[in-house]
């Protein structure tokens, strides 16, 4: 274990009070706890390092010794407390019921029982399903309690006995450098129990892979990336151990008309040059049916028109968003000779009319160019 400065490990100054030390340790413990970082091999070392730093800096006596002598104060074991303290005491002081946060029980005297792993399932929804809510049936394979032994892991209840290595505590004290730390018992896996005659079907694990089908209720207003938690529907934890949770993650398929940004929906409304110039009432689709919007005379391409209350009501709110319509003026193609002649005549009338500002963006553009070279 690296002998980094304890203040540096927790990220606090040497004048930090106990509240600052506790707050810094809590943040690191939440970040690096092994139960939250099963795929990060370095997390456990960082967690232990932070715990050691907190054990010293939270004790007035040990902190004073560390400030005077540094790590040398503990070369022969932790002073005063005899052997480095109990991490359960630290957790109880900092987090209260630590098991509620990390899914495992650390209660006094009992075995250390790990909960089943959480599972993740990605479900695809249409925009309409996400906005209105729906029920979906999902199927997956995951560890579930063994039918043969009812999840006990043993042929008979009498085959489950107290672990003789940890005496039912689920933890053993291990010496690591100049600290003594509590670790899960390697013989019983932290349960405090051992099985004399394991179930032949699950080999004592209490769980077996099974295919499952569940109906999931998707609440109205979910968005891409939102998760629906199904408590206790995750991986079975084994004999006498709490199940993990199932997280159903939403993926919303792209829509051919609408895009969503928070509570608002966006869409393009294509109109002709003549409709933009003369103005027109245009019928557009919404998720609640068709509505008509007024395109004002002289509307420019890119203009945003807001239709209030035609958006989405997100989860956990009652405020419905709007539908934002972006006007897209389409330039005509494949014109006939007659149409081209008419357009040229129309253009001539624009060029010859100096009294009216009929092309505001064009006039503004050329004025800016002129200002640039003046």
Curated annotation (Swiss-Prot):
Homodimer. SMART domains: DnaJ. Participates actively in the response to hyperosmotic and heat shock by preventing the aggregation of stress-denatured proteins and by disaggregating proteins, also in an autonomous, DnaK-independent fashion. Unfolded proteins bind initially to DnaJ; upon interaction with the DnaJ-bound protein, DnaK hydrolyzes its bound ATP, resulting in the formation of a stable complex. GrpE releases ADP from DnaK; ATP binding to DnaK triggers the release of the substrate protein, thus completing the reaction cycle. GO terms for biological process: chaperone cofactor-dependent protein refolding; DNA replication; protein refolding; response to heat. It comes from the Bacteria. Zn(2+) 1 binds at residues 146, 149, 199, 202. It is found in: Cytoplasm. Disulfide bonds: none annotated. This is Chaperone protein DnaJ. Its cofactor is Zn(2+). Keywords: Chaperone, Cytoplasm, DNA replication, Metal-binding, Repeat, Stress response, Zinc, Zinc-finger. Belongs to the DnaJ family. One of its GO terms (molecular function) is ATP binding.
């Amino acid at each position: 274990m690296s002998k980094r400065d304890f203040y540096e490990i927790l990220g606090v100054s040497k004048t930090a009070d106990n509240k600052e030390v506790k707050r810094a340790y809590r943040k690191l413990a939440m970040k690096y706890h092994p139960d939250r970082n099963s795929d990060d091999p370095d997390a456990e070392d960082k967690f232990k390092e932070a715990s050691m730093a907190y054990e010293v800096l939270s004790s007035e006596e040990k902190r004073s010794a560390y400030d005077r002598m540094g790590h040398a104060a503990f070369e022969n074991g932790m002073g005063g407390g005899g052997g480095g303290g109990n991490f359960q005491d630290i957790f109880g002081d900092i987090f209260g019921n630590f098991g509620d946060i990390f899914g495992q029980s650390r209660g006094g005297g009992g075995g250390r029982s790990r909960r089943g792993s959480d599972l993740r399932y990605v479900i695809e929804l249409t925009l309409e399903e996400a906005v209105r809510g729906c029920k979906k049936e999902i199927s997956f394979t995951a560890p579930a309690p063994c039918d043969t032994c009812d999840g006990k892991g043993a042929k008979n209840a009498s085959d489950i006995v107290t672990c003789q290595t940890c005496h039912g505590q689920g933890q053993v004290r291990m010496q690591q450098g100049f600290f003594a730390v509590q670790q899960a018992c390697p013989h019983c896996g932290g349960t405090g129990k051992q099985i004399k005659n394991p179930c032949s079907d699950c080999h004592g694990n209490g769980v077996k892979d099974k295919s499952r089908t569940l109906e999931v209720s998707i609440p109205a207003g979910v968005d891409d990336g939102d998760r629906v938690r199904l408590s206790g529907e995750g991986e079975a934890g084994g004999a006498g151990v709490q199940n993990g949770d199932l997280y159903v993650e939403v993926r919303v398929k792209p829509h051919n008309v609408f895009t969503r940004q928070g509570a608002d929906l966006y869409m393009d409304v294509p109109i002709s040059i003549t409709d933009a110039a003369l103005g027109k009432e245009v019928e557009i689709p919404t998720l609640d049916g068709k509505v008509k919007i007024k395109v004002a005379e002289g509307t420019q391409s890119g203009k945003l028109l807001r239709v209030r209350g035609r958006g989405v009501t997100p989860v956990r709110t009652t405020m419905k968003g709007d539908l934002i319509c972006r006007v897209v003026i389409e330039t005509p193609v494949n014109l006939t000779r007659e149409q081209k002649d008419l357009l040229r005549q129309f253009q001539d009338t624009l060029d010859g009319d100096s009294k009216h500002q009929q092309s505001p963006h064009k006039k503004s553009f050329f004025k800016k160019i002129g200002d640039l070279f003046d």
